[in-house]
A protein has these predicted regions:
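N-terminal helical cap/lid subdomain that shapes the substrate entry/recognition surface
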Residues: 3-92
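Conserved Lys-Pro-Asp/Glu-containing loop-to-beta segment of HAD-superfamily phosphomonoesterases
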Residues: 7, 145-172
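Conserved H-loop
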Residues: 37, 128-133, 158, 201
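A short, structured active-site edge motif that brings together acidic residues
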Residues: 44-45, 128-143
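Short beta->alpha linker loops
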Residues: 48, 89-93, 114-115, 139, ...
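Short phosphate-binding/catalytic loops that engage adenosine nucleotides
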Residues: 62, 104-106, 180, 200
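Short, acidic loop-to-helix structural element flanking the phosphoryl-transfer center
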Residues: 83-110, 116, 120, 145-146
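Acidic, Mg2+-coordinating phosphoryl-transfer loop and its flanking beta/alpha structural elements
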Residues: 163-205
Length: 214
């Protein structure tokens, strides 16, 4: 017998908040700083959406020695984002989804690699902070599986009692390692094409489709 889903853990960027335009602009800036050879902006965005981090490094011949610089640039972009949060929009249908999940008694969390202060500011701006039990953030961009496992332990949840709702290929790979079922959202970074190849447990096109899964 399948266990009842008790909780949903949401990613933030590209899942709840539409930070994609900001993200893409920063990716282009980073590509220039990394001196990626013969890159075209359209190609960079396309590959970011369809390849894993490891595949991206290989495709653009980026040395892993550049990782500290990349992490530094990502963190700087996140700090800069704080003052732009007022302009970031929530994806259509998310507010209604959160309200319905709460009615069903589903516990809702956020786990993201963004800064906690950015997330809290956005939740309060959109008046949806009351729906979340807790907001977790991680510092390891490529080690989300360990963080997810630790969150489940802290919250007393088992892997078959929870879904992670997210939009990136690295999220899907982390869920596979952690043995957590992921609901992939087609409106985020990887899109339907990118997530299809990672074999996510469910792939949805609209937020309210989640209600059929819990």
């Amino acid at each position: 017998m399948t266990k009842k889903i008790k909780a949903l853990i949401f990613d933030f960027d590209g899942t709840i908040a539409n930070t994609l335009p900001y993200t893409f602009s920063k990716i282009i800036e980073l590509a220039k700083k990394l001196k990626v050879k013969d890159f075209k902006e359209k190609e960079i965005i396309e590959k970011i959406r369809s390849l894993s981090p490891q595949e991206l490094f290989s495709h653009f011949s980026i040395s892993w020695l550049k990782m500290p610089l990349i992490i530094w640039e990502v963190k700087k972009a996140q700090k800069d984002l704080y003052n732009k949060m007022d302009k970031i929009k929530i994806f259509p249908g998310i507010k209604k989804l959160l309200k319905e999940l709460k009615k069903k008694g589903i516990k809702i969390y956020i786990y993201s690699s963004n800064l906690k202060k950015n997330i809290i500011k956005f939740l309060e701006k959109e008046k949806i902070d009351q729906y979340f039990e807790n907001v977790y953030v991680g510092r390891n961009l490529l080690g989300k599986d360990k963080d997810l496992i630790n969150i489940l332990k802290k919250e007393g949840l088992k892997t078959d009692e929870v879904y992670y709702v997210a939009d990136e290929i690295r999220d899907a790979l982390a869920c596979q390692k952690a043995k957590i079922k992921m609901i992939g959202v087609s409106w985020g970074l990887a899109g339907e094409r990118g997530l299809t190849k990672t074999k996510v447990y469910y792939l949805i096109k609209k937020p309210d489709e989640i209600l059929k899964l819990v």
